[in-house]
Structure formats: structure tokens, C-alpha cells
């Protein structure tokens, strides 16, 4: 039986001809039988693809041959081509859609002026060092707010954002001005959103900004469920969520009955389809699989 895997990676580097990279990446994935999503811009690449293990290995090896992609940090997880509906390779103004394509500065070394990178072990050392000095490290979630319903760092601030486009308005709202003189650690799934978010925060006067290198994925690989992370990790494919060990807590609650759950379901209203947490029992009927307070759509 063939082994299958999913890889997640990104790379910030100047790309002079994004469309040429798009054509190359599509041809490579089609040749290897891979599916997934790849976004390319003048600032780099953001990819999640899956397929047969040897094919994925060849894909990673070939992708790293591109000058700007030599040092990409690839995260591996269980899954395969069947976890994605198709192969999508597109050129966009941004590889993460914050709505600020002109603000991000990128050079051959990556994002210019972003937060200080912290490996998982360095994060723990920072927390301990600040604690000894009577300071508290603030964890700042760089994902869409709903993702944090099933997993987040302990006591993290979860901004009220439906998409990454909402972050700039949220940062400029004044809600977080009290954090501008505090040590703030941004985190997200694989690290890419925090590359941009941390630079946006620095540009708006946050003085001590860090970003979790490799994101929640790398942290979970390192500490499983024995560290500062609680719950499951939301992922944007058919798996919907993943856990780092059998000891993972279930912190999500069914919107109907408050039973523990980590499973998101789409609202059964075809014109709505909002993702909401439901337990297995409440998700079993179209009548209960509706937004409890009425659909927004």
C-alpha cells in the first residue's frame, strides 16, 4: 500500500516572473499526480500539496532547486491527494491576503522588518526569562477567529477577525494599544501569516514583536500536548483538524448543546454554509445543522 503525505511550506523572496513560476509549479504537480493549493506573488510562494510519498519528496526536491526556495521550511503531515478537491495554482497580489500588498517589503532574506523569529524551544526560554523579570508574554493569534475555537495557546488574545483582511482595521482600532510596550508573540498555522502580521504590527508601533518559527505545526511536532498549546489545530482541507497526540484536549463546544467537539460543519442552508462547531449528534439532522441565531446570508 502506497504511503501518502501532505506538505505545507512558504517562502518570501522576490519573484520577477510569478506567472512563469505558476506554470512550472502546475506542470510539476500534474506530472507527479499531486493536488492542493499553491499561491504565487512577486513576494514569494505559499503551498499546501498532497500525494504519494515519493512523488511529494520529488516535488520538494525540485522546488528547492529554484534559487529563492533553497531554504524553505517544509512541514510534513499525514494525508494525501484525496484531501484536496483538485490542484489550484494561482498568481495573486499577496500570498497571504491582508489587503496591504504595497506595505510588505521582501528581499532575498525574506520579510524585511518583521518580528523576531523564535523556535519552539526559544519561545519557552523567552516566557521563562520574562517571567523571572515579572513580565508576561502576550500570545497574539494570527489566524481567523473561528480557528481558535478548537485550539490556541493558553490565555492567547484572539482578535475579532473573520479573514486576514480584517487584521489591519483591528490593529488600528486602538483595542491593542496597551500591548505596544509588551512582548508579543504572534502565531499561526505554519508561520506565514505571522511573517506579514508581525511586520504590520511593527509598522504600527508595537515595540517588541516575535513570531513563532514554523507556526503551531512546528511547535506541536516539538512539544506535542505537553507545552503551552491547548486543543486541536484547524487545517484548510478535508481533514478539517489535526491533533499532536492522544492527549490533546477538546476545548471546542457544540453550538447547540455545548458538548465537547473539534468538528466544524457547514450550515445546512445552501445560501449560508457558515462553519460552526457541532457534536456528532447535533450534526446528524439538517434541522439542527442550522445557525442557531439565524443565518447571516
Curated annotation (Swiss-Prot):
Q: Which catalytic reaction applies to this protein?
A: uridine(34) in tRNA + AH2 + O2 = 5-hydroxyuridine(34) in tRNA + A + H2O
A Gene Ontology MF term for this entry? oxidoreductase activity, acting on paired donors, with incorporation or reduction of molecular oxygen
Asked whether the keyword Oxidoreductase is assigned, the reply is yes
What Pfam families does the record point to? Rhodanese, Rhodanese_C, UPF0176_N
The record's EC number reads 1.14.-.-
Q: Which GO terms describe its biological process?
A: tRNA modification
What PROSITE patterns would the database entry show? RHODANESE_3 (PS50206)
Q: What keywords were assigned to this record?
A: Oxidoreductase, tRNA processing
Give the active-site positions.
Answer: 188
UniProt entry tagged with the keyword Ubl conjugation? no
Role summary = Catalyzes oxygen-dependent 5-hydroxyuridine (ho5U) modification at position 34 in tRNAs.
Spell out the protein name for this chain. tRNA uridine(34) hydroxylase
Amino acid at each position: 500500500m502506497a504511503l501518502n503525505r501532505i506538505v505545507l511550506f512558504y517562502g518570501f523572496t522576490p519573484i520577477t516572473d510569478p506567472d512563469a513560476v505558476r506554470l512550472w509549479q502546475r506542470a510539476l504537480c500534474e506530472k507527479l499526480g499531486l493536488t492542493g493549493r499553491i499561491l504565487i506573488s512577486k513576494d514569494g510562494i505559499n503551498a499546501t500539496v498532497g500525494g504519494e510519498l515519493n512523488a511529494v519528496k520529488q516535488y520538494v526536491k525540485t522546488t528547492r532547486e529554484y534559487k529563492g526556495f533553497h531554504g524553505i521550511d517544509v512541514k510534513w503531515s499525514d494525508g494525501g491527494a484525496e484531501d484536496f478537491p483538485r490542484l489550484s495554482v494561482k498568481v495573486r497580489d499577496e500570498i497571504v491576503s491582508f489587503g496591504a500588498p504595497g506595505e510588505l517589503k521582501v528581499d532575498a532574506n525574506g520579510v524585511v522588518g518583521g518580528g523576531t523569529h523564535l523556535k519552539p524551544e526559544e519561545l519557552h526560554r523567552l516566557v521563562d526569562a520574562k517571567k523571572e523579570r515579572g513580565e508576561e508574554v502576550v500570545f497574539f493569534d494570527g489566524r481567523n477567529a473561528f480557528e481558535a475555537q478548537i485550539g490556541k495557546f493558553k490565555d492567547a488574545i484572539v482578535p475579532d477577525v473573520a479573514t486576514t483582511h480584517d487584521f489591519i482595521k483591528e490593529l488600528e482600532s486602538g483595542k491593542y494599544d496597551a500591548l505596544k510596550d509588551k512582548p508579543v508573540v504572534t502565531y499561526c498555522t505554519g508561520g506565514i501569516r505571522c511573517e506579514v502580521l508581525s511586520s504590520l504590527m511593527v509598522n504600527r508601533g508595537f515595540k517588541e514583536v516575535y513570531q513563532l518559527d514554523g507556526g503551531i505545526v512546528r511547535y506541536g511536532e516539538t512539544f506535542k500536548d505537553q507545552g503551552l498549546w491547548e486543543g486541536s489545530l484547524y487545517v484548510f482541507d478535508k481533514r478539517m483538524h489535526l491533533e499532536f497526540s492522544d492527549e490533546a484536549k477538546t476545548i471546542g463546544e457544540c453550538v447547540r448543546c455545548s458538548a465537547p467537539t473539534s468538528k466544524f460543519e457547514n450550515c445546512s442552508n445552501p445560501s449560508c454554509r457558515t462553519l460552526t462547531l457541532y457534536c456528532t449528534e447535533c450534526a446528524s439532522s439538517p434541522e439542527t445543522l442550522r445557525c442557531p441565531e439565524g443565518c447571516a446570508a
